[in-house]
């Protein structure tokens, strides 16, 4: 029957890895709607080292276009404020004691179109990664069939399974892209 040297489950996991990576990349695109993950790249000079913002403060989303950053240590407020301003996210903190409020500005039409292009680029990169996994799987199947480790019928059946898995993941990528595009273009 089928040799243990081909694992369709492993191929599916590798394809899902591309989807997970895409979700992370799309999550980082600023859409004009507040998200605590927007501040993930912010590094604060704290206690002699660079630390992620979420390790020195609590980030919440009290309103759709407002982020609230509650700094735990009063002495860190200025450092957090500086890190946010220096992060090139285009956010200006309004400080009230140990709480920094960040208004998320509206996106103009031109910026929305740029973000859609970036989202398409991310999705295409994910599709290419999935196709590479498919090609690796099909190459492995051809080698197994050539070495008589699996029959020609098994090779065709498994190649069909690989293609179905690929189509499924590509469809999922298209759905993620469509959702993000709708989110970006919604005013």
UniProtKB/Swiss-Prot annotation:
InterPro entries found in the cross-reference section: Ribosome_recyc_fac (IPR002661), Ribosome_recyc_fac_dom (IPR023584), RRF_sf (IPR036191)
Species of origin reads Nitrobacter winogradskyi (strain ATCC 25391 / DSM 10237 / CIP 104748 / NCIMB 11846 / Nb-255)
Under Pfam families, the record lists:
RRF
Q: Which UniProt keywords apply?
A: Cytoplasm, Protein biosynthesis
Q: Which NCBIfam families match?
A: frr
Q: GO: which molecular function terms?
A: ribosomal large subunit binding
| Gene that encodes the chain | frr
Q: What is this protein called?
A: Ribosome-recycling factor
Q: Tell me where on the tree of life, at the top rank, the source sits.
A: Bacteria
Q: Which family does it belong to?
A: Belongs to the RRF family.
Q: Which GO terms describe its cellular component?
A: cytosol
Keyword Cytoplasm listed? The answer is: yes
Q: Does the keyword Protein biosynthesis apply?
A: yes
């Amino acid at each position: 029957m089928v040799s243990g040297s081909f694992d369709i489950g492993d191929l599916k996991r590798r394809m899902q890895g591309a989807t997970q990576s895409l979700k992370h990349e799309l999550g980082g695109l600023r859409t004009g709607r507040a998200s605590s993950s927007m501040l993930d790249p912010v590094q604060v000079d704290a206690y002699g080292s660079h630390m992620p913002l979420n390790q020195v403060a609590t980030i919440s989303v009290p309103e759709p276009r407002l982020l609230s950053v509650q700094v735990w240590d009063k002495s860190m407020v200025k450092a957090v404020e500086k890190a946010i301003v220096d992060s090139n996210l285009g956010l200006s903190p309004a400080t009230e004691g140990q709480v920094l409020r960040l208004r998320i500005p509206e996106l103009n039409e031109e910026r929305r179109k740029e973000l859609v292009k970036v989202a398409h680029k991310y999705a295409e990169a994910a599709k290419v990664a999935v196709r590479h996994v498919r090609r690796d799987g099909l190459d492995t199947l051809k080698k197994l069939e050539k070495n008589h480790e699996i029959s020609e019928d098994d090779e065709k059946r498994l190649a069909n399974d690989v293609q179905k898995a690929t189509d499924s993941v590509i469809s999922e990528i298209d759905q993620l892209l469509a959702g993000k595009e709708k989110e970006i273009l919604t005013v």
